Amino acid sequence: MGIFHQSTFANLTRDLLDSAEPFSCGNDDLDDFFFQDSFDYASSLFGKSYCFYVTRAKTIEIICAFTVSNASIFTNRLPNTRKKKVGEEVPSAKRDLIYPAVLIGRLGVNVKYQRNGERIGTCLLDFIKFWFTEQDKIIKLDVDIWLWMHIIL
């Protein structure tokens, strides 16, 4: 069982960041978002940040963090084949031009766990997909990840 499956899911709070070992995902703008801007982002109701962390010998280590926001999928901007795919799970009486979605706005994996075989980014995306499709029955996820591909793989 990998480190991701041994970790704890939590809100990303100032107290958690202050009590944890230094967390960096290797991108200064993304690190700054998680340490500074994410709290204003949440208080303005733009999105909520979460993390997974492990506790070892009284130290906390954040292994990854992400931010989700409410979003919409505007089907009138999609090609017909994609439009049909988006609406196929919705009864025809409820089909519309706009569907609610969840936006993954920021996602970062601790540099210590990038490209180490643990596949933290993949596990995290699988968790988010499960969280919003199985638990809350939200239909679609909209992914707008603002980072380099090597960070999430």
Predicted regions and their residues:
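Non-catalytic substrate-recognition and accessory regions of acyl/acetyltransferase enzymes
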Residues: 1-116, 123-149
